[in-house]
């Protein structure tokens, strides 16, 4: 799963409220929580939730890309073998949220091929290659799994499939087009 250049009110890629979420082999980049408050996380906002992140890349443009809040109940974030912009100090923990920063995490530019053109393949020099959890299934090339949505080398063109829209006033019986967005 790749979520990039998305803009929402809270959690530009993921907004978790009273949820349990596993984020594995995902890439979140350059998303925006477009509110007047900076505490809503450009990439991930979590409140009264448990989120597990593994073998993923979360690489936004600002500090505070991940907000772990405990506003209405316990909230926990578990991160391992992932490339997180700003590293552990870049995660904003408010009101007693719990962060479990486990093995294998890095804070290095993932070196995407061309993120401005939505090409999130890893370049040959990417620090995310062979940097995933060594206990995960191997990549198709037989090496340790990579971080992020794509394995390297991957000789496929990026998928320019359909774009679906989601809005708070949407309806899941809609077709997901701009005029008729989904609700979730």
Q: What residue spans do the PLM features occupy?
A:
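Feature marks short, surface-exposed loop/turn motifs that line or immediately flank catalytic pockets
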Residues: 32, 151, 172
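Short, polar loop/linker segments at the starts of domains and inter-domain junctions
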Residues: 38-40, 45, 119-126, 141-144, ...
